[in-house]
From Swiss-Prot:
SMART domains according to UniProt: AT_hook
Modified residues (Omega-N-methylarginine): R26, R58, R60
Biased composition (Basic and acidic residues): 15-24
Organism of provenance: Mus musculus (Mouse)
Keyword field: Acetylation, ADP-ribosylation, Chromosome, DNA-binding, Isopeptide bond, Methylation, Nucleus, Phosphoprotein, Repeat, Transcription, Transcription regulation, Ubl conjugation
Gene that specifies this protein: Hmga1
Region (Disordered): 1-107
Compositionally biased intervals (Basic residues): 55-74
Protein name: High mobility group protein HMG-I/HMG-Y
Bias (Acidic residues): 93-107
Keyword Ubl conjugation: yes
Modified residues (Symmetric dimethylarginine): R26
Positions of post-translational Asymmetric dimethylarginine modification: R26, R58, R60
Bias-annotated ranges (Polar residues): 1-13
């Protein structure tokens, strides 16, 4: 029974290839550009009436992930206000943290 099913699909596929218009593509079909009667006559020759503007990229640029900060901004907090966000580590604190880790490993 499965053999008859596969045989019947063969002729259908060949008919679709002959027509050329009936293709079963995946996803959304491409939008066909509107054909105006004036351009249909010229057809083979395109005249660039004006230079098309390139599309602007959206979102984050590709190479920006690994770059460091271009400007380092000094954070100055007003007296009496708490700084927002995670507190920044100072070099002294980093060294203390490293020495604490090594002392824990020794124990």
């Amino acid at each position: 029974m499965s053999e008859s099913g596969s045989k019947s699909s063969q002729p259908l596929a060949s008919k679709q290839e002959k027509d050329g218009t009936e293709k079963r593509g995946r996803g959304r079909p491409r939008k066909q550009p509107p054909v105006s009667p004036g351009t249909a006559l010229v057809g083979s020759q395109k005249e660039p009436s004006e230079v098309p503007t390139p599309k602007r990229p959206r979102g984050r640029p590709k190479g920006s992930k690994n770059k460091g900060a271009a400007k380092t901004r000094k954070v100055t907090t007003a007296p009496g206000r708490k700084p927002r966000g995670r507190p920044k580590k100072l070099e002294k604190e980093e060294e203390e943290g490293i020495s604490q880790e090594s002392s824990e490993e020794e124990q």
